[in-house]
Amino acid sequence: MPTNWRISSFNGVLLAAYFIPTWTIVAFKIMISPVHAFYERPNIAVALFISDHLHLAAMPTIRAAWLLALGKLTVVAFFAIFLVFITRASIRKTGGGDEALAIALAIGSVISFASMVMASEVGETQALRLHATELLMLLGTAIVLLVEGPAQSQTDRGVTSGDPALEQSQLAYDR
């Protein structure tokens, strides 16, 4: 049975299955209760770094929490757009959803890398492991997406470029 799934598409679907629910839940918890949710396990490194190293007051800390939630929801939105694109076989075969996947991977990698660096600075080993794992998943998919190359467009193989019917005729006055 032939399949028309590209490796990067399949890997992107698996990543979307992880990141959409987890980052959506984390972002909505931040929206509901910014201070309480900011100090939970997925965000503790960012919260401690902001409060300890940047010495921000309560309102700027809440704004930073909302900014983190907005960034995570942006990644979730691009993963959702990728899933919508991947449902159509014609778009999936030509790699039409690769742009949405690439944007989700780029923004998600920046957020995970920054969170990992902040976890390293404040000494949160469990948060460091979580963000390093997320970063490795995102970078692994990005490498697969880059190595796989662009999708081949479907052309009519019956017509070749050497066919005389496709050549433009040259007239005496056209030279």
Region locations from a protein language model:
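N-terminal signal-anchor transmembrane alpha helix
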Residues: W5-H36
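Hydrophobic alpha-helical transmembrane segments of polytopic
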Residues: N11, L15-F19, L68, L101-I111
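Helical transmembrane-bundle signal
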Residues: F19-K29, V75-F82, G108-S115, T141
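Juxtamembrane transmembrane-helix termini
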Residues: K29-Y39, F82-G95, M118-E121, A151-Q154
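Membrane-interface interhelical connector segments
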Residues: I32-P60
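Individual transmembrane alpha-helix segments
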Residues: A58-V75
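Alpha-helical transmembrane segments of multi-pass integral membrane proteins
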Residues: A106-R175
